[in-house]
Amino acid sequence: MIRIPFKRDGFATEMKPKISGNNLSLEYDNIESSLMKVGADIARTLPQKLIDRLVDNYLAGNAPEPDATALDYLQRAMLHFSVYEHLIFLITRVSNDGVTVKKNDDETTAYKYQTDELKNKLITTAWFWMNLLIQFLNEHLDDFPEWAESDQRKAFFELPIDLNDFNRWVGVALAGGEYFMMCAGWIIREVWIDCVRSRFPEPTKTDAIARAVCYEVMGRATLRLAYSALPEPIRIDIDNEMGKNHRAQADQFIKEKVSGIFLSKAETYWNALDLEIKKKEMDEDRKNAGDRPLLGERNFTESDKFFYT
C-alpha cells in the first residue's frame, strides 16, 4: 500500500507555502496519481517504516519535533517531484474533443523554454529538500532508529565512491547529491565490481580510480535512471541535445549520445589505468629477473676429462 503525507481536505491552502508557484486552484485530486507515483518511488529510497511514522504523525495532526521538520522536508520534496511528474497533464486538457491546451483572455500556455526551465527547477528543488531530509536524519540518528538501522543508510555509507568524488570529477552538486547517490548506488557498486575489482583484487581508491568510476557511472546512469533521478549536468546535456534535434530523434537515441560522451571519457581513464598496471608488472618482472641467478653459465677447467656442448 502506498502511503503519502498528504490529505485531500485543505490540500491547496496547506501546501501552497511548501511549493514554489503553486496556485490555490491546484487541488489534491488534480495531481493525486502523481503524488502516489512519487510516494512509491520515495519508498525505494527511504525505509517504509520511517515513511509510515511520518505519515501517521501527519494524519494525527500533532507531529512533534524532530518529526515535524522531517515531515516538512519530505512533503516539500514530494510536492516538487509530483508537479514535475504531472506537468504535462497540467498543461494539456484531454476530453472528447481531443488533446488541447488552456487559453483564455487572462491566461495562456507557457513557451517551451519556460516549461523546460520549470522542469529543471522542480527537479533541482526536489533534490534540495531530499538532501536536507537525508542530512537531518543523519544528524538525529537516535531520534530516527527506522533510518539509523535501515538497509538504505547502510548501503549508502558502504559505497566505495562518495559524493565529493562526483562533485570533483563530474560536477554533481553537493546540495542534493545525496539523493543521486542513493538512486545510483546499485550502479556505483556494479561499476566497482566490473571495472575496479577486476583490475585490482584489493583495490584502494585513488584519484585515477575515482575519476574513471565517476565517468563510468554517469554514462551508465544516463541510460538506466529516470530523468528526474539524473544530476543537473546530465539533464542539461540531454536538454541541449533535445534542442538541437527539436525532438526529431527518439529520447533513447539522445540519451545514448550523452551517455557515450561520458563512457568514452571513462574508457580513456580505464586505459590509462591499464597502462599503469602493465608498467608496474613490467617493472616487477625486471626486478625479479635481476634477482635470479644466471642460467647456462659455462664453467669449464682443463681438469675436466670431457664435456658436451
Language model features by range: what are they?
Residues 1-76, 85, 89-214, 218-309:
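Conserved short "hinge" loops at termini or chain/domain junctions
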